Swiss-Prot record:
<dbReference type="InterPro" id="IPR014722">
    <property type="entry name" value="Rib_uL2_dom2"/>
</dbReference>
<dbReference type="InterPro" id="IPR005825">
    <property type="entry name" value="Ribosomal_uL24_CS"/>
</dbReference>
<dbReference type="Pfam" id="PF00467">
    <property type="entry name" value="KOW"/>
</dbReference>
<dbReference type="InterPro" id="IPR008991">
    <property type="entry name" value="Translation_prot_SH3-like_sf"/>
</dbReference>
<comment type="similarity">
    <text>Belongs to the universal ribosomal protein uL24 family.</text>
</comment>
<dbReference type="GO" id="GO:1990904">
    <property type="term" value="C:ribonucleoprotein complex"/>
</dbReference>
<keyword id="KW-0687">Ribonucleoprotein</keyword>
<dbReference type="GO" id="GO:0005840">
    <property type="term" value="C:ribosome"/>
</dbReference>
<dbReference type="InterPro" id="IPR003256">
    <property type="entry name" value="Ribosomal_uL24"/>
</dbReference>
<dbReference type="GO" id="GO:0006412">
    <property type="term" value="P:translation"/>
</dbReference>
<keyword id="KW-0699">rRNA-binding</keyword>
<comment type="function">
    <text>One of two assembly initiator proteins, it binds directly to the 5'-end of the 23S rRNA, where it nucleates assembly of the 50S subunit.</text>
</comment>
<dbReference type="InterPro" id="IPR005824">
    <property type="entry name" value="KOW"/>
</dbReference>
<protein>
    <recommendedName>
        <fullName>Large ribosomal subunit protein uL24</fullName>
    </recommendedName>
</protein>
<dbReference type="GO" id="GO:0019843">
    <property type="term" value="F:rRNA binding"/>
</dbReference>
<dbReference type="Pfam" id="PF17136">
    <property type="entry name" value="ribosomal_L24"/>
</dbReference>
<dbReference type="InterPro" id="IPR041988">
    <property type="entry name" value="Ribosomal_uL24_KOW"/>
</dbReference>
Length: 104
């Protein structure tokens, strides 16, 4: 079970975008994740009339390493860590500071 999943609210704790918040759009296999509106890069693309794509400079999100983000606890409005608890035979994710379940 992963500590950070898709649609979790995270905050960047290290790097050029430190302090920015966003939702996890995609979790990649090599401990990286794509966060909406964070770590934006510019890509120069050629037009492709067969696909109907316009050329130009496109801004898109680049992957961040999972160690540079922390899950955001909306109850305390701070970054938090994730732990696991077994309830009714199911493993659930909980915030370390409040021991309350993480709502995705």
């Amino acid at each position: 079970m992963q500590k950070i999943r898709r649609d979790d609210e995270v905050i960047v704790i290290a790097g050029k975008d430190k302090g920015k918040r966003g939702k996890v759009l995609k979790v990649l296999a090599d401990d990286r994740l794509v966060v909406g509106g964070v770590n934006l890069i510019k890509r120069h693309t050629k037009p492709n009339p067969m696909l109907g794509q316009q050329g130009g400079i496109v801004e898109k999100e680049a992957p961040l390493h999972v160690s540079n983000v922390a899950i955001f606890n909306t109850e305390t409005s701070k970054a938090d860590r994730v732990g696991f608890k077994v309830e009714d035979g199911k493993k659930i994710r909980v915030f370390k500071s409040t021991q309350k379940p993480v709502q995705a």
